[in-house]
A protein has these predicted regions:
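Short C-terminal tail/terminal secondary-structure segment
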Residues: 43, 122, 133-153
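C-terminal helical subdomain
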Residues: 78, 97-128, 132, 139-141
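Active-site helix of classical SDR
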Residues: 10, 54, 62
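Short, flexible catalytic-loop segment of classical short-chain dehydrogenase/reductase
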Residues: 59, 80-91
Length: 153
């Protein structure tokens, strides 16, 4: 699902965007593709090799598609969330001790909210982000800064 599902969706979207072309009254771009990745696109995760590998695959999928579709005025980017308060990671923040341990990985010292991701997606789909393509934007409170090295390693 992580990689194949996104490939199938973006393939069909790209076909439709190319068919329609740019419609200046709607947008500067013919289309915008937003992939969902994760901080594990760049942070290894032992014990979760299949997940981390699929997220690395999403990065290359998105970058290759961005390169291929840019001449058609189609932008492709990814959002790479860190810890977001959703049911899938509830066990990592079930108790105050577990949440404190999770927050040691997040320099900004808070778990993200689904609205954080939604707001970024809305912005990436807007003409305000028209010159951005082929990029993963990490929405992670600084997890990808590797906070364990903040004190000099």
């Amino acid at each position: 699902v992580n990689l194949t599902g996104q490939f199938l969706c973006l393939r069909e979207a790209a076909r439709e965007f190319i068919r329609r072309g740019v419609q200046p009254e709607i947008s500067k771009a013919a289309g915008k593709i937003i992939c969902m990745s994760s901080v594990h696109e760049v942070i290894p995760w032992g014990g979760h090799v299949n997940y981390a590998a699929s997220k690395g695959g999403i990065m290359q999928l998105m970058k290759s598609v961005a390169q291929e579709l840019a001449p058609h005025k189609i932008r492709a980017n990814s959002i790479g969330p860190g810890a977001i308060a959703t049911p899938i990671n509830l066990s990592a923040r079930d108790t105050p001790e577990e949440e404190k341990a999770l927050l040691t990985l997040i320099p900004y010292n808070r778990v993200g909210n689904p609205d954080d991701v939604g707001n970024l997606a809305a912005w990436l789909a807007s003409d305000e982000a028209d010159y951005i393509t082929g990029q993963t934007i990490f929405m992670d409170g600084g997890m990808t800064l590797y906070p364990g090295f903040a004190e000099g390693g």
